[in-house]
């Protein structure tokens, strides 16, 4: 059976939740392989609306959920999220959710350091969610992280906490922030251990068995390619790799397990927080897109910045992310707009570039090169076949395919799960 990997092709918030939910109903296993509880999905199933940040989306469809070792896990946030969905009738148990025993933990000191650093940056703040994701990844790379498996070994926790506090308390004190005590953290971790450890296992074994048995595996990415720590708009990025290649390291599977890679992109562009956004419309057009698209972050509640579709940016995401097909969402938001613009490149100091350069100063100076395309007066909302779309809307989609050098294989025309036009089944063998 074919596997599918879903990743964002812009700066996140592309509508991955709906597409993941739609595909999860046909998968056997749904796997998170990077990120933490800093990105959210909103899923509507029947009369229930689920807001997930850490749990794999497939759980709401009764599928096995797996959190891989590439995810940084806040145990308090995880248990709170499990509690919320249980109150909604979703029974999350160790039989339905498995977590990599070597996944790093996010502790309260990580969030404290995150907040203290952002405050110290002032006008140069990155715009993190303040949930400790970055500091937790730093500890993983520096070999001082506390991992889920350590919860079973108090003697290991003892010396790991010494190393962790030496580093973090030094930084916190230097930033004028309160420091942490070892005894309190130890008590918290020992209290969490019996609640977290029943979910833990070497998930690479389970995924190897799933692959061997022919199960369909859906790998669920968080954030998006242009927030990738290597390939995104650095330093205004997340702290993990978000491209499809990350599933091998972040889930403990071989690179061939990715299967078909589906990138998700809105029919326009949005971004939360700081960072370059060449096609941003800080005007009435941007406000109109935000109002129509209900552009507020699931996790932060922050209003998203809005602008025209940036084909040069998405083309870059297609190439570095290994994207083989594009799911285009929120096409209906553009209904009734007489003229549309598509970013096709960037102008920097008289030079035109087909891609966004890596340098922060160059990115800040980048001015978009636009191609103008006629809009449409009819409605695309709720369309479930190409025959239901206005001719000009089809032309818009076709032009995007040409510019990003990737076929649009799925179109979403409303938040409703079934308002989807499928041109190519990503699970097809």
UniProtKB/Swiss-Prot annotation:
Task: Give its E.C. classification number.
Answer: 6.3.4.4
Chain positions recorded as substrate binding sites? 298-304
Known cofactor(s)? Mg(2+)
Q: Which SMART domains does the entry link to?
A: Adenylsucc_synt
The domain of life is Bacteria
Assigned GO CC terms? cytoplasm
Q: Which NCBIfam families match?
A: PRK01117.1, purA
Where does the protein end up?
A: Cytoplasm
Give GO MF terms, alphabetically: adenylosuccinate synthase activity; GTP binding; magnesium ion binding
Q: Where does IMP bind?
A: 13-16, 38-41, 129, 143, 223, 238, 302
Q: What does this protein do?
A: Plays an important role in the de novo pathway of purine nucleotide biosynthesis. Catalyzes the first committed step in the biosynthesis of AMP from IMP.
Residue positions of the active site:
13 (proton acceptor), 41 (proton donor)
Q: What InterPro entries has UniProt attached to this entry?
A: Adenylosuccin_syn_GTP-bd, Adenylosuccin_syn_Lys_AS, Adenylosuccinate_synth_dom1, Adenylosuccinate_synth_dom2, Adenylosuccinate_synth_dom3, Adenylosuccinate_synthetase, P-loop_NTPase
Q: Where does Mg(2+) bind?
A: 13, 40
> Which BP terms from GO are recorded?
'de novo' AMP biosynthetic process; IMP metabolic process
Mind telling me what this protein is named? Adenylosuccinate synthetase
* Chief localisation class: cytoplasm
Q: What is the free-text note on the cofactor?
A: Binds 1 Mg(2+) ion per subunit.
Reactions catalysed, semicolon-separated, are:
IMP + L-aspartate + GTP = N(6)-(1,2-dicarboxyethyl)-AMP + GDP + phosphate + 2 H(+)
- State the species of origin: Acidiphilium cryptum (strain JF-5)
Q: Where does GTP bind?
A: 12-18, 40-42, 304, 330-332, 412-414
Q: Please state what class of enzyme this protein is.
A: ligase
Transmembrane ranges, per UniProt, are none
Subunit structure, per the record? Homodimer.
This protein's pathway: Purine metabolism; AMP biosynthesis via de novo pathway; AMP from IMP: step 1/2
One protein family per Pfam? Adenylsucc_synt
Signal peptide residue numbers: none
């Amino acid at each position: 059976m074919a596997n599918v990997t879903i990743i964002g092709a812009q700066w996140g918030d592309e509508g991955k939740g709906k597409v993941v939910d739609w595909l999860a109903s046909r998968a056997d296993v749904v796997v998170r392989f990077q990120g933490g509880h800093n990105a959210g999905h909103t899923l509507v199933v029947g009369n229930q609306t689920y807001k997930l940040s850490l749990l794999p989306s497939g759980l709401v469809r009764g599928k096995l959920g797996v959190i891989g070792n590439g995810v940084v896990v806040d145990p308090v946030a995880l248990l709170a999220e499990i509690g919320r969905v249980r109150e909604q009738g979703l029974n999350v148990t160790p039989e339905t959710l498995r977590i990599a025993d070597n996944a790093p933990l996010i502790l309260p000191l990580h969030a404290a350091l995150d907040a203290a650093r952002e405050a110290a940056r002032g006008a140069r703040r990155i715009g993190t969610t303040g949930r400790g994701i970055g500091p937790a990844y730093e500890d993983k790379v520096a070999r001082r992280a506390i991992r889920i498996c350590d919860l079973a070994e108090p003697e290991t926790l003892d010396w790991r906490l010494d190393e962790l506090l030496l580093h973090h308390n030094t930084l916190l004190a230097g930033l004028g922030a309160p420091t942490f005590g070892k005894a309190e953290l130890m008590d918290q971790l020992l209290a969490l251990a019996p609640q977290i450890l029943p979910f833990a296992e070497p998930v690479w074994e389970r995924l190897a068995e799933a692959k061997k048995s022919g199960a369909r595996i859906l790998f669920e990415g968080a954030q998006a390619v242009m927030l990738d720590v290597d390939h995104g708009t650095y330093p205004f990025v997340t702290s993990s790799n978000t491209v499809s290649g990350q599933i091998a390291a972040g889930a403990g599977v071989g690179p061939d397990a990715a299967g078909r890679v589906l990138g998700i992109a809105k029919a326009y562009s949005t971004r939360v927080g700081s960072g370059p956004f060449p096609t941003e419309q800080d005007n009435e057009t941007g406000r109109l897109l935000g109002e129509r698209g209900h552009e507020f972050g699931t996790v932060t509640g922050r209003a998203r910045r809005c602008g025209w579709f940036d084909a040069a940016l998405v083309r870059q995401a297609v190439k570095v992310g290994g994207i083989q097909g594009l799911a285009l969402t929120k096409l209906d938001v553009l209904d009734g707009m007489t003229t549309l613009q598509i970013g096709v490149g960037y102008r920097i100091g008289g030079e035109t570039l087909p891609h966004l350069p890596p340098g922060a100063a160059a990115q800040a100076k980048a001015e978009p090169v636009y191609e103008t395309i006629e809009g449409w007066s009819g409605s695309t909302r709720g369309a479930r076949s190409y025959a239901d779309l206005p001719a000009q809307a089809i032309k818009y989609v076709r032009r995007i395919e040409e510019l990003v050098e990737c076929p649009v294989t799925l179109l979403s025309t409303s938040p409703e799960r079934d308002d989807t036009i499928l041109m190519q089944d990503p699970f097809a063998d």
